[in-house]
C-alpha cells in the first residue's frame, strides 16, 4: 500500500488491473483499499474499443498489467485520464510499451516492490459505504457499465457464500474462475477469506483438467457458472470420478439432463443461487433444499427485500 501511495495513489483514485489470476492481483487489491482508493479489475480478454471504453471511463491513476497482455493497449486512447504510472507484472517492461503509457512512469513489478515506501500515516480504514471496486458489466445492452461497489456490498458477497456453503477453516476452495469477476473474487476468494479457509487458484477453467486440479488441491468446494458444469459432466466418465474431497459445487443454472447424475457421479451436493454484480446474491439454496431446475433457493431476508 505504501508503495502505491509513493506513486501518488490516494482516496478516491482508481487502480486499474488487467491481470490474470495471480497473487499480485490480490495483494494490490488490498493495498488499494488501505489507501481509500478504488480497485478496477477488468476482463483480461478485452481489446480495442472494448478496452478503451473501460480505460477512459475508469480514468485510473495507476495501471497494473501482465506483461504478456500489454499489447492489448496498443491503439487505445486514455481520453482525459492521467495515468501517472504503469506496473508490468510477470515479465518486466516490454520492448514496445504501448503509446498510451508514454507519459507514465514505467515499472516492472520488481521495480515497484523496491520503491521507497510512503509514510504510514496515509493508511486508512475504509467505511462500509466507501467505494471498493468499479466492476464492469458484460455489456449485454450496450457498452459495459461500471458498477460502483461499496465495501459493505462486496463483503456481503463473501459473507453470503460463507454462510450458504457453511465454509469453515478446514475447507479448501478451488477457484478456476477469473478474479476480475465478482463470482471468483468476492464469492469464492472473499468467502474463503472470511471463513479462514484455504484457496487454490488456477489461471483459467479447463474441463479436461478440472478433476485433476480438484484432487491435487484436495478441494472441498468449488463454483461452476453457466455452461461450466455441463462441460465437466460431458467429459468422459470414469468409475473413479467420485474419488475426490468435494462436498459442494455451487452451480447455476442446472439442467434435468445432467444435474442429478452430476451429484451421483462426483459424490457432491449442488447448490444454486441467483444474483448480479449490481444486486449481490440475494438467494441461495441450502443444505436441506432439493435440487430443482429453475430454483435459485431462498432469499437471505436478513439482508435483502425481494
Per-segment meaning from a language model:
Residues 2-49:
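Conserved AMP-binding/adenylate-forming
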Residues 19-20, 37-56, 67-72, 197-216:
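ATP-dependent adenylate-forming carboxylate-activation enzymes
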Residues 19-22, 43, 167, 177-181:
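Conserved AMP-binding
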Residues 30-35, 57, 181, 190-194:
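Short hydrophobic alpha-helices that are characteristic scaffold elements of the AMP-binding
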Residues 101-110, 114-136, 143, 166-172:
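Conserved pre-ATP/AMP-binding loop-to-beta segment of ANL
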Residues 132-156:
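Conserved AMP-binding A3 loop
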Residues 155-172, 180-220, 229-231, 235:
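Conserved AMP-binding/adenylation subdomain of ANL enzymes
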Residues 216-224, 233-293, 298-306:
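Gly/Ser/Thr-rich phosphate-binding loop
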Amino acid at each position: 500500500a505504501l508503495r502505491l501511495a509513493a506513486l501518488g495513489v490516494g482516496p478516491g483514485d482508481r487502480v486499474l488491473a488487467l491481470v490474470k489470476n495471480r497473487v499480485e492481483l490480490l495483494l494490490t487489491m488490498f493495498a488499494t483499499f488501505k489507501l481509500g482508493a478504488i480497485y478496477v479489475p477488468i476482463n483480461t480478454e478485452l481489446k480495442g474499443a472494448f478496452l478503451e471504453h473501460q480505460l477512459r471511463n475508469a480514468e485510473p491513476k495507476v495501471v497494473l498489467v501482465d506483461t504478456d497482455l500489454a499489447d492489448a493497449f496498443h491503439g487505445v486512447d486514455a481520453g482525459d485520464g492521467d495515468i501517472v504510472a504503469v506496473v508490468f507484472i510477470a515479465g518486466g517492461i516490454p520492448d514496445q510499451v504501448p503509446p498510451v503509457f508514454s507519459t507514465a512512469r514505467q515499472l516492472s513489478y520488481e521495480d515497484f516492490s523496491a520503491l521507497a515506501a510512503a509514510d504510514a500515516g496515509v493508511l486508512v480504514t475504509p467505511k462500509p459505504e466507501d467505494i471498493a471496486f468499479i466492476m464492469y458489466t458484460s455489456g449485454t445492452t450496450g457498452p459495459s457499465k461500471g458498477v460502483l461497489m461499496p465495501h459493505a456490498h462486496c463483503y456481503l458477497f463473501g459473507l453470503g457464500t460463507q454462510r450458504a456453503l457453511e465454509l469453515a477453516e478446514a475447507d479448501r476452495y478451488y477457484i478456476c474462475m477469473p478474479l476480475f469477476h465478482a463470482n471468483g473474487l468476492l464469492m469464492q476468494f472473499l468467502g474463503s477469506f472470511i471463513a479462514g479457509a484455504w484457496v487454490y487458484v488456477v489461471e483459467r477453467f479447463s474441463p479436461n483438467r478440472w478433476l485433476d486440479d480438484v484432487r491435487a488441491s484436495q478441494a472441498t468446494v468449488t463454483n461452476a457458472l453457466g455452461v461450466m458444469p455441463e462441460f465437466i459432466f460431458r467429459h468422459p466418465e470414469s468409475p473413479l470420478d467420485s474419488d475426490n474431497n468435494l462436498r459442494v459445487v455451487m452451480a447455476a443454472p442446472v439442467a434435468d439432463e445432467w444435474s442429478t447424475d452430476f451429484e451421483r457421479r462426483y459424490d457432491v451436493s449442488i447448490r444454486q443461487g441467483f444474483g448480479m454484480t449490481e444486486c449481490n446474491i440475494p438467494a441461495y439454496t441450502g443444505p436441506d433444499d432439493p435440487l430443482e431446475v429453475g430454483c435459485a433457493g431462498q432469499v437471505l431476508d436478513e439482508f435483502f427485500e425481494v
